[in-house]
Amino acid sequence: MTSDASHMLEAALEQMDGIIAGTKTAADFSDGTCEPGLSPPSTCLNSMPVLHLIEDLRLALEMLALPQEREALLSQVPGPTATYIKEWFEDSLSQVNHHGAASNETYQERLARLEGDKESLILQVSVLTDQVEAQGEKIRDLEVCLEGHQVKLNAAEEMLQQELLSRTSLETQKLDLMTEVSELKLKLVGMEKEQKEQEEKQRKAEELLQELKHLKIKVEELENERNQYEWELKATKAEVAQLQEQVALKDAEIERLHSQLSRSAALHSDHAERDQEIHRLKMGMETLLVANEDKDRRIEELTGLLNKYLRVKEIVMATQGPSERTLSINEDEIEGSFRKWNTTNKSPEEVPKQEISPRCSSPTPGPPPLPQKSLESRAQKKLSCSLEDLRRESGDKCVDGNQLSPVGEPKDSSFLAEQKYPTLPGKLSGATPNGEAAKSPPTASLQPDSSGSSQPKLNRGWSVSAPVLRDTEGGWEDIVSSASSGTESSPQSPVTPDGKRSPKGIKKFWGKIRRTQSGNFNTDAPGMAEFRRGGLRATAGPRLSRTRDTKGQKCDANAPFAQWSTERVCTWMEDFGLGQYVIFARQWVTSGHTLLTATPQDMEKELGIKHPLHRKKLVLAVKAINAKQEETSALLDHIWVTRWLDDIGLPQYKDQFHESRVDGRMLQYLTVNDLLFLKVTSQLHHLSIKCAIHVLHVNKFNPNCLHRRPADESNLSPSEVVQWSNHRVMEWLRSVDLAEYAPNLRGSGVHGGLIILEPRFTGDTLAMLLNIPPQKTLLRRHLTTKFNALIGPEAEQEKRDKMASPAYTPLTTTAKVRPRKLGFSHFGNMRKKKFDESTDYICPMEPGDAVSDSHRVYGVYRGLSPLDNHELDGLDQVGQIS
């Protein structure tokens, strides 16, 4: 609509030119007159299109109903055109209004006015022409833009087609991938099913192993319980034998008292005292009967526990299978022991009915007496208070051979008058407060009879229920060993001629387990080793006598290691920290020469030492004791090493070091493989242990060489700082106003030796370990200044030289030490060289390699340092897989 109006306006303007050209004719035509000689009347008709155009313009404007559209159209009309049309309409209206006045004007005036109008119109036309040209240029520009957009549209359509094609191909690939994913899911389900089956099998295998371990532990516990029950049974037998002897003695005492009463009836008419004495004796007998009943109940309890143990053993035997028959105890032997015990054990009702003459024979022989430890541990627990009363009331009696002699009678009445109860025995001469025996000589002792068993002969100078204390216990235990082996050993147990059981079946999986006979007490047996006096299962509390010296230790104290006896070697291993292998050592080691000639493979096979560091510990100790080398590092045990780990700031490895029994000598010969086996994989921790061992070397393995507490802060030298412990370094951090960061050093392995001896350990490394953010530059600068002042100028210069070297790599907390990867050419050496034969010592310096450079204290440490640069840079490449 707007474009049509513009075209109409342009046409009207073109017509205006013709109007201007024929102004006079038009004026004449408008007046209705045509002069002769002018243009014909047809020229007067040229104004008709203008009228039509104006009429069309009016109709077009009427069609624009909205004012906004009219305003928009008006704004598009050029200003001169609108002004001209306005003036034209005003002139037309003025001509209509002043037609009468205009008619009087002359043609010349009208012509001049029209000329002026023509000029103005020409000017307007030129302006409009310029505007039309400008709009034409804009139209051409728009056409060019349109062509460009058309090209872009075509390109976009082509790209759209390509995108559609690629999308189609992607859809096809997607379908293929979905098909492959489905197949992979099926395979995954199958693999998961197989994995579940494998895990189920592995879980069952682990459960089987756990069950086997539990069964092994259960068998060991049952074995220990059986041994304890055997000890308690023997102790009970000995106590019952003592009680029977006491009953016999009391019966003889009663008969003697009856005879004394019959003889002294004329002298003592006081029946009240006699009745009181008889009542007192009756009470003693009743108390003794109650004690016997208690012992019977105890025997019944032990019998029930033994039966329970036998039932559990049968269950274990059913689980283990018939191959474990050789590990079971002899049930017939136990039952025979019970039958023999029941024959010797009289019921409490039968005891007072026995007729015993005043000169009675010796009591019935009981089981062989127990070792001194057993009597000491049970003397105050098992006997009742009635026995204590009877012990206090028992007099000076003497059993000589098979005859019991009564107490001598008083010779005069004055002695009877002094005694309130003349027929009762006097006080027993006991022990002195310091544990020594009284001066009254004993009149009886334990004497072995011809059958090999010992017949207990009571020493009445001592208490009946108290253990007989002596300086040594060898005689007692020899009697016990000979008696038990001679009277109660069973020939039915399947043993080999050399006294060892042959391992069969699942016994190989459990290890070599040696079980004792039910009635056999062998002090050298592995199961009895824990009952040895002075061992782990010794009597609690202070010892009542001097510990028995092992046979042969007195005579071979200065003997070479190759001539050591089995017992001495086992004692040495137990004191050395390898007591868990003593059981197998008793079976395999015949003398010290066995260990001297043994290889690590023999130790693993015969002694069951699977732990490589345990083998290494034993090999080093055997070499040192055979060569009689005086190494100060050997004085530091594995307990000290755990405390040493606390001092150097590595307490997280205490369990591994303690389990491996790492002592001072092993620190001296510690290798990189050993550290990797101990789960020390951090490069920083390797360097920490290396520097700490080096400090020990320089100080000749002085156990107190590390300083744990602050001393003089004003005068610190590198020789003092190198001996700082981790705790001392933390105290130094607190002294330099870094207390909030000091706890971060726990478990870091930072100590004085690492600070001084490690060239790559700088102030930045310490700041990194303290977790000081890099943004806190002032705090890091303060720490670096204090650190450089602490280590001294020589160490500072060495660290700077190290940092300036082209091969320098900064020390980090994440660097790991990995085992060295061996090529095919190293496989032969790898087969020949085992784990515990490696010589790649982490600190190979010997204590005797010291340099006489004492005027430079720092040089004493740095001059002897084994920490060379190429070793430090390549530490993450060391280690060897065995």
Curated annotation (Swiss-Prot):
SUPFAM superfamilies: SAM/Pointed domain. One of its GO terms (molecular function) is identical protein binding. Residues 442-457, 481-495 have a biased composition (Polar residues). Residues 564-628, 636-699, 724-789 form the SAM domain. CDD domains: SAM_liprin-beta1_2_repeat1, SAM_liprin-beta1_2_repeat2, SAM_liprin-beta1_2_repeat3. Residues 388-399 have a biased composition (Basic and acidic residues). This is Liprin-beta-2. It comes from Mus musculus (Mouse).
